[in-house]
């Protein structure tokens, strides 16, 4: 006879938990919120996530890492990686107002976890550093190919794009308007044109 499946195996459970963390932040999300959002009973939840809320949050954040890893794979095979990076940023302007208000769960985590939880903060910081390296690598390759005229070192441009990403996380909350965001994004991305 087969036992109950564990909820951890269900990708949708992690996505549902991620949505609550994204909306409320780690500190404001209760175990009750997570159980309600995921439909998991207390016993099942605690048996699956022995590390409690922190473990669920770590898995939700790591799920976002997978999205960045997928983007990195696309960059590596793209004939126009700079255009792909630009499209990535420009697509943010098309997001819904609710998505603008949520911002980026990774950047949000860095801000929220400073002085609260060093492990969670460092995990989010590492994801942003990995994205920075992804941008840096793509820029470096395009400079080598002669597809990018700027002589600014790729490491500086990679950090610039992460700085822009984190600033955009705030700007989109201030101005959740597609046209305002698109204009700002295009202006900021002129550095890699």
Feature locations, PLM:
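Hydrophobic alpha-helical connector segments
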Residues: 73-102, 154-161
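Amphipathic alpha-helical segments used for helix-helix packing
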Residues: 84, 98-119
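Helix-turn-helix
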Residues: 12, 16-55, 59
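N-terminal intrinsically disordered/low-complexity leader segments
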Residues: 1-7
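Short, basic, alpha-helical segments at the C-terminal edge of helix-turn-helix-like DNA-binding modules
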Residues: 61-67
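Hydrophobic alpha-helical segments that form the core
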Residues: 151-171, 187-188
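Amphipathic alpha-helical packing segments from all-alpha helical-bundle domains
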Residues: 73, 83, 118-144, 156
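C-terminal peripheral helix-coil segments that are non-catalytic and often amphipathic
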Residues: 90, 132-133, 137-141, 174-193
